[in-house]
């Protein structure tokens, strides 16, 4: 320790004259204290010195070092002291005698006593005795001092939080409390440093001591302490882990008890709480809620011997979200009584009608009967079958829990306008067209709205005047005596009113007919349109017929050869024939022969192209025919599914193709698939497109009508389920009236109002208007086809009863 730290009383900045005065005062006080034998206490800051001479030499050397270090520090910092800062009174030119004396000389006669001596006297043990005569040791009170805590110990190096790396390029490590430099210890040669890094000394930590700058190593005591902590041993050597056990409480027999509290009365009185519990069990036994095991066995044996036939055998099932109770059978009605009222008994006609129906279509599976007495009722023959069906329903039919919703039924009904405000629409039958001997499959009306064409299973095509119902033209295209398998599947007028061409699909042939009912100009224009294409048909190929005959033997094979030319594909799918003389007299101008039966035909809006559908023709199911060039081509190399219907877009070069479960929209100009609609039905029957081209109607054989908005998703916008049987036909009004109608095998026609708004944010408005009935159901077939008048709100229908009807306002 330095001189300043040992003394602890003088400041570096105090003048020397003041120090000398204090020294003289202390010498006087020391002599007075020595005479009175009073002791001067110092806090153990001065250590014992060997001799006064050695102390003076050491003091002189330290003064020299202090002067040298102060001089060097002033030179580095460039500090200059102003002489005016010092007081002139504290300085004198004459030397003083007391300057040569050291502080140790001044306090040499003082007797120093450390705190350890005081504590050893204060902290003494007193020995007394207990009341029983045993020895009692009273130890001194523990004072909470910081003997072992070094958290507030001051560091020798006073650089604070500055890292030692800041002094790497300097010869010193920092400064002590007096501002002196702490010089860096001398380092050995490079070889010594290498050897030290290879042979690490014991206790090496790799750290540097902040106070000295040398390596910080652990002592043997610290290493031993670390070893004990790692091995979970006691770090204090004074603790004996195997000290002998002293029975402090059981070694001596106690004469008096620890507590002499007398026992309470409740220890000797029966418990009231236990009495309540016992009485609760006794009441349960008396009431039968608790049964002894012996009686339980007796009851089980008695129940086994005395079986109750009419007892409820339902096993109690805990209420759980996964436990769904089986629905109970409905109670018997008056019809099932052995003596029902007369109004429940069936007549002979009703019995025959009930017996003629299929068992699945019957409303009830029994006939009501009347007996005079209960003893006359015979055994029920259907009991075994009903029990068997009940068992099948219990373990095969899925169970669903329907949560009841507290919703006002009137709030679910949309607010629709009144049908009276949406007139005109057809409400009654005004004309019936009779003449066909078999069911009428298809009807069509000419663009002018004057002539109605009908095609029937009797093989004839008839044209009627719509206002009077008079038949003006009749042509027999199929001889039923020779060919009774083919039918008139479809027919449609050419949209061009100046041609008067009627396309009729009969079996595998397509007949282009110009009926002689329009006048010379229109009939001549129609024939010229058809005959102008014969020059384009051959392409100069004389062996056309031979190629077609060779291909007829392979018509069941798939024509998927990608190397075939476009002309060969067009010529292979269909063949155009001119009519013979007899067919010309009937008004037939051209015949197109396909490979399979043609089911549907639809014209393009310009009247030059028409598309046909042959569901059994595989990849050539859809054919596009050109009237002006007598060309037939298949737009698809493969048909995905069985094709049911196909139609052109009203004004875009797009083709709508309906299979059994999907509707695909193709762009004919770019030859790509535009969109695929998913109606979500099992079997589509027909489709129709709104005149604006942004909505589509589809009907299905599973009693559904689907409205698709092409601007929305691929799923239906609305699904209408109001028909009881398969829906055969559905049609939009092609004029300016927002109407559409659907026909079904239930013999009903439903008229709807369907407004499509120009605003894309507004959904179409669908309002049911009228239900028309009049056609008879023959062999479970009702109405087969519908067509709207091109200008008026009139509807034409074709039924299986062999009649066509006009429904007007």
Swiss-Prot record:
Residues 267-383 are annotated as: Required for interaction with NOP7. It comes from the Eukaryota. Pfam families: BOP1NT, WD40. PANTHER family: RIBOSOME BIOGENESIS PROTEIN BOP1, RIBOSOME BIOGENESIS PROTEIN BOP1 BLOCK OF PROLIFERATION 1 PROTEIN. InterPro entries: BOP1/Erb1, BOP1_N_dom, WD40/YVTN_repeat-like_dom_sf, WD40_repeat_CS, WD40_repeat_dom_sf, WD40_rpt. GO terms for cellular component: nucleoplasm; PeBoW complex; preribosome, large subunit precursor. Residues 30-70, 77-97, 553-563 have a biased composition (Acidic residues). Residues 383-419 are annotated as: Required for interaction with YTM1. Belongs to the WD repeat BOP1/ERB1 family. HAMAP family: BOP1. This is Ribosome biogenesis protein ERB1. Its main location: nucleus. It is found in: Nucleus, Nucleolus; Nucleus, Nucleoplasm. Residues 1-107, 545-569 are annotated as: Disordered. It comes from Scheffersomyces stipitis (strain ATCC 58785 / CBS 6054 / NBRC 10063 / NRRL Y-11545). Keywords: Nucleus, Repeat, Ribosome biogenesis, rRNA processing, WD repeat. Coiled coil: none annotated. WD repeats lie at residues 435-474, 483-523, 593-635, 638-676, 679-718, 722-762, 778-809. One of its GO terms (biological process) is maturation of 5.8S rRNA from tricistronic rRNA transcript (SSU-rRNA, 5.8S rRNA, LSU-rRNA). SMART domains: BOP1NT, WD40. The lineage of its organism: Eukaryota, Fungi, Dikarya, Ascomycota, Saccharomycotina. Component of the NOP7 complex, composed of ERB1, NOP7 and YTM1. The complex is held together by ERB1, which interacts with NOP7 via its N-terminal domain and with YTM1 via a high-affinity interaction between the seven-bladed beta-propeller domains of the 2 proteins. The NOP7 complex associates with the 66S pre-ribosome. Gene3D superfamilies: YVTN repeat-like/Quinoprotein amine dehydrogenase. PROSITE patterns: WD_REPEATS_1, WD_REPEATS_2, WD_REPEATS_REGION. Component of the NOP7 complex, which is required for maturation of the 25S and 5.8S ribosomal RNAs and formation of the 60S ribosome. GO terms for molecular function: ribonucleoprotein complex binding.
């Amino acid at each position: 320790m330095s001189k300043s730290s040992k003394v602890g009383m003088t400041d570096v900045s105090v003048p020397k004259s003041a120090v000398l005065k204090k020294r003289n005062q202390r010498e006087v006080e020391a002599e007075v204290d020595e005479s009175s034998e009073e002791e001067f206490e110092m806090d153990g800051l001065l250590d014992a010195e060997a001799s006064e001479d050695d102390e003076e030499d050491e003091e002189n050397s330290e003064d020299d070092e202090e002067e040298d270090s102060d001089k060097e520090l002033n030179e580095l910092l460039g500090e200059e002291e102003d002489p005016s800062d010092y007081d002139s009174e504290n300085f004198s030119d004459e030397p003083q005698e007391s300057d040569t004396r050291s502080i140790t000389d001044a306090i040499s006669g003082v007797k120093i006593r450390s705190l350890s001596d005081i504590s050893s006297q204060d902290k003494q043990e007193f020995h007394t005795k207990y009341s029983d005569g045993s020895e009692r040791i009273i130890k001194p009170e523990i004072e909470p001092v910081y003997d072992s805590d070094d958290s507030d110990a001051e560091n020798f190096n006073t650089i604070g939080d500055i890292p030692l790396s800041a002094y790497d390029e300097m010869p010193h490590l920092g400064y002590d409390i007096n501002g002196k430099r702490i010089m860096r210890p001398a380092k050995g040669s490079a070889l010594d440093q290498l050897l030290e890094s290879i042979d690490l000394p014991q206790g090496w930590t790799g750290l540097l001591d902040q106070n000295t700058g040398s390596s910080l190593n652990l002592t043997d005591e610290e290493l031993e302490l670390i070893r004990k902590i790692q091995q979970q041993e006691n770090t204090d050597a004074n603790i004996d882990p195997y000290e002998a056990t002293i029975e402090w409480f059981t070694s001596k027999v106690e004469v008096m008890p620890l507590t002499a509290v007398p026992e309470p009365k409740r220890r000797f009185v029966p418990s009231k709480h236990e009495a309540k519990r016992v009485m609760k069990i006794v009441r349960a036994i008396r009431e039968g809620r608790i049964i002894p095991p012996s009686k339980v066995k007796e009851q089980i044996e008695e129940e086994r011997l005395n079986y109750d036939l009419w007892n409820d055998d339902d096993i109690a099932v805990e209420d759980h979200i996964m436990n769904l109770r089986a629905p109970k059978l409905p109670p018997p009605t008056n019809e099932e009584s052995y003596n029902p009222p007369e109004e429940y008994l069936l007549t002979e006609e009703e019995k025959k009608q009930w017996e003629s129906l299929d068992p699945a279509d019957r409303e009830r599976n029994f006939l009501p009967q009347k007996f005079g007495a209960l003893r006359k009722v015979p055994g029920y023959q259907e009991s075994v079958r009903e029990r068997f069906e009940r068992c099948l329903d219990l373990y095969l039919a899925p169970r669903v829990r329907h949560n009841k919703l507290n919703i006002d039924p009137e709030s679910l009904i949309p607010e629709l306008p009144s049908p009276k405000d949406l007139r005109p629409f057809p409400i009654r039958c005004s004309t019936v067209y009779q003449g066909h001997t078999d069911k009428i499959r298809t009807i069509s009306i000419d663009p002018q709205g004057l002539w109605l064409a009908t095609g029937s299973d009797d093989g004839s095509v008839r044209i009627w005047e719509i206002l009077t119902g008079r038949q003006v033209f009749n042509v027999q295209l199929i001889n039923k005596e020779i060919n009774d398998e083919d039918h008139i599947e479809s027919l449609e007028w050419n949209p061009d009113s100046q041609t008067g061409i009627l396309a009729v699909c009969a079996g595998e042939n397509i007949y282009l007919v110009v009926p002689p009912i329009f006048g010379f100009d229109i009939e001549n224009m129609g024939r010229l349109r058809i005959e102008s294409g014969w020059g384009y048909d051959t392409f100069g190929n004389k062996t056309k017929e031979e190629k077609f005959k060779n291909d007829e033997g392979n018509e069941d094979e798939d024509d998927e050869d990608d190397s075939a030319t476009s002309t060969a594909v067009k010529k292979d799918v269909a063949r155009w024939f001119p009519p013979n003389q007899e067919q010309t007299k009937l008004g037939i101008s051209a015949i197109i022969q396909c490979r399979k039966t043609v089911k549907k035909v639809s014209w393009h809006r310009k009247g030059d192209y028409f598309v046909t559908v042959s569901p059994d023709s595989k990849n050539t199911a859809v054919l596009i025919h050109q009237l002006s060039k007598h060309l037939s081509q298949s737009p698809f190399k493969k048909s995905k599914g069985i094709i049911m219907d196909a139609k052109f877009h009203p004004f875009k070069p797009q083709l709508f193709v309906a299979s059994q479960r999907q509707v695909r929209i193709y762009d004919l100009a770019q030859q790509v698939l535009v969109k695929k609609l998913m109606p979500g039905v099992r079997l589509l029957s027909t489709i129709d497109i709104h005149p604006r081209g942004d909505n589509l109607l589809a009907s299905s054989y599973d009693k559904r009508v689907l409205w698709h908005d092409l601007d929305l998703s691929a799923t239906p916008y609305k699904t209408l389920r109001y028909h009881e049987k398969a829906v055969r036909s559905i049609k939009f009004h092609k004029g300016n009236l927002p109407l559409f109608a659907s026909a079904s095998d239930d013999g009903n026609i439903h008229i709807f109002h369907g407004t499509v708004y120009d605003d894309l944010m507004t959904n179409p408005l669908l309002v049911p208007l009228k239900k028309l009935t009049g056609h008879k159901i023959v062999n479970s077939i009702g109405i087969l086809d519908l067509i709207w008048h091109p200008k008026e709100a009139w509807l034409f229908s074709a039924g299986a009863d062999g009649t066509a009807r006009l429904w007007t306002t």
